[in-house]
């Protein structure tokens, strides 16, 4: 991905009406965050998931199980998470830290979240996007596919839908594997995709009225 391609994707997202990008389980070059600063696009920055999968209890309120990782694994996580934060801190576009995604390797949630909040008290912390919920951090984040749905609500925190959508459209000449295409639902024409996307977007309105604060469409590329 060239610098021009990175900027093109950001500008296109802005033209499509998005005001935030969740940098999902990866880290971009420093120039990408610079472009977000200039274009006025907010960023949620994830920690890339590590270790083995954990017991997933997304719909359990504040009772999720933490994984027992080795001390070496814990130390590596803490070191690399700090390095990611140090890289991104100078960028005002970065407004939310996301230490865990779903329950992938999720461990010592309250300790990690509290450390993150202390290390950077200027930003919000989303403990585990769609993960096992613990009574810490600033946000309660759920995932639901394909259409939007929120099955929990926390009156003490910001409530968000961290992932929904997953609309797939196989395009000849752009497939890396023609036997399988990405997507929770798949369509054959751009018009069908647009209609499905608009249906999901309109259904989000009712959640705004109920007090929910944000939603992340997953995803603009495969």
Spans of model-derived segments:
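A conserved hydrophobic secondary-structure block that centers on an alpha-helix together
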Residues: 10, 15-22
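N-terminal carbohydrate-binding accessory modules
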Residues: 1-13, 34
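Substrate-binding/catalytic cleft of secreted carbohydrate-active enzymes
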Residues: 20-222
